[in-house]
Amino acid sequence: MTIVNLAAYHFVSLDAIEQWRPLVTARCNELGLRGTILLAPEGINLFIAGPREATDAFVDYLRHDPLFEGKFATLQFKESLSDSQPFRRMLVRLKREIITMKKPAIKPELGRAPSVDARTLKAWLDRGHDDDGRPVVMLDTRNAFEVDVGTFDDALDYRIDKFSQFPEVIDANRADLEGKTVVSFCTGGIRCEKAAIHMKEIGIDHVYQLEGGILKYFEEVGGAHYHGDCFVFDYRTALNPQLQPTESVTCFACRAVVTPQAQQSPDYVPGKSCPACAQAAAAA
């Protein structure tokens, strides 16, 4: 059976999430969906999967059910397909933020930084500069272990362990960005949306966010100017530029990503350990 995988987020003020949670959970279970939906006062972030009829019904539910008062009427979804269900269960969780940055003054609902679509970005990278002749720098806003699976060529990567560290590292390294067109990016767009706003607020000029993130870029232009795969937070582990699951796996012991190359190491024992485990043990 073909499984449809949907990802979406939307920054919008929500004040009834406690009442919504059991109703949304019940609807997902009724449709046989699995995945995770985060609800917070600042919006919604979701990753769900199921048969086509079920995902279509859920999209219609979010966009049109009177319960949501039109809050999700314009919610846009990114879609990919898989041969099996990548999630084990269905969770609807309440959070303070749909992506934790610990900068409560940043409210994307009140205004976004400019965005650049995939085709325009590819044209800039092909030329080596934007439409005004400024050099383009790609800024990866993801965690270090995600970057190691794949990223844009020559992207800036500050090796953060969690997104809440992003403001601090940008404040310390803003000289890297001066005089350039900065394009922040992440998996699906949610982190780079907050990241771009922060950079604008601290006075960095010519900042853009990649519309729809890496996955939308793959969908529209493939893997141009990108090397490796894209880590995803489900049991597929990583998607290639054709949006197909790869042979990468997640280590059962330490949760590190184990690429096909790393699986050739004698330190890789399926279900038990991996090269990252061995490295951590040696450093202990």
Swiss-Prot record:
What CDD domains does the record tag this protein with? Answer: RHOD_YceA
Span of domain Rhodanese? 132-226
Keywords (A to Z) from UniProt:
Oxidoreductase, tRNA processing
Query: Which EC number(s) does UniProt give?
Result: 1.14.-.-
A GO BP entry is: tRNA modification
Q: Which InterPro entries match?
A: Rhodanese-like_dom, Rhodanese-like_dom_sf, TrhO, TRHO_N
Name the chemical reaction catalysed here: uridine(34) in tRNA + AH2 + O2 = 5-hydroxyuridine(34) in tRNA + A + H2O
Annotated GO MF terms: oxidoreductase activity, acting on paired donors, with incorporation or reduction of molecular oxygen
| Keyword tRNA processing belongs to the record | yes
Q: Identify the domain of life.
A: Bacteria
Q: Where is the active site?
A: 186
NCBIfam families from the UniProt entry: PRK05320.1
Q: Write out the similarity annotation.
A: Belongs to the TrhO family.
The record describes the protein's role as: Catalyzes oxygen-dependent 5-hydroxyuridine (ho5U) modification at position 34 in tRNAs.
Record protein name field: tRNA uridine(34) hydroxylase
Q: Which organism is it from?
A: Burkholderia vietnamiensis (strain G4 / LMG 22486) (Burkholderia cepacia (strain R1808))
Upper lineage ranks?
Bacteria, Pseudomonadati, Pseudomonadota, Betaproteobacteria, Burkholderiales
